[in-house]
């Protein structure tokens, strides 16, 4: 997640390059474009200086989450917090994350799919779990295919919100 102040710093830095420089993707990434190659080293140095991680395994920066119950009235689960916890657990694991470059992980705090979980390799969407009491949990979906012969991810299980980070490394 990028803060307001960080976005202002980026905007100030790229302003001299013109109006057609920044794009935001459906995967919640910021793309800087139309920057002459002779300035790319400066861009890299600047982003590193303001704390934008560029050397982490792609999977860690490829986890998309909707805003969830933090600010959404429909949210059941804290999806942004779940994404942050997943990044932390995966980053500390011994898993070969560099081999998982093309894997997408999407999280929605409720069934509404704002986090686009149905279009991901591994997706989660919030639900109310019930045992002896109600608790926040996630449905697990997997196997979406984008492109030729597209297919939506299919429901494969569920996990409590508390156990979600551990689930990602098991």
Name these PLM-found stretches.
Residues 1-133:
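Small-residue-enriched alpha-helical segments and adjacent helix-cap loops
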């Amino acid at each position: 997640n990028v803060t307001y102040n960080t976005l202002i710093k980026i905007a100030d830095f790229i302003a001299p390059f013109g109006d057609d420089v920044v794009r935001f993707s459906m995967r919640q990434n910021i793309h800087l474009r139309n920057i002459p190659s002779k300035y790319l080293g400066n861009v890299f140095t600047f982003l590193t200086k303001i704390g934008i991680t560029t050397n982490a395994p792609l999977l860690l920066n490829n986890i998309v989450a909707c805003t969830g119950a933090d600010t959404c009235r429909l949210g059941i689960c804290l999806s942004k917090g779940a994404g942050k916890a997943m990044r932390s657990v995966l980053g500390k694991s011994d898993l070969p994350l560099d081999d998982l470059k093309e894997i997408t992980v999407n999280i929605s705090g409720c069934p509404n799919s704002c986090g686009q979980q149905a279009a991901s390799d591994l997706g989660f969407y919030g639900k109310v779990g019930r045992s002896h009491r109600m608790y926040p949990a996630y449905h697990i979906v997997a196997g979406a295919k984008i492109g030729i012969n597209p297919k939506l991810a299919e429901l494969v299980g569920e996990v409590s919100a508390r156990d979600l980070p551990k689930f990602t490394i098991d």
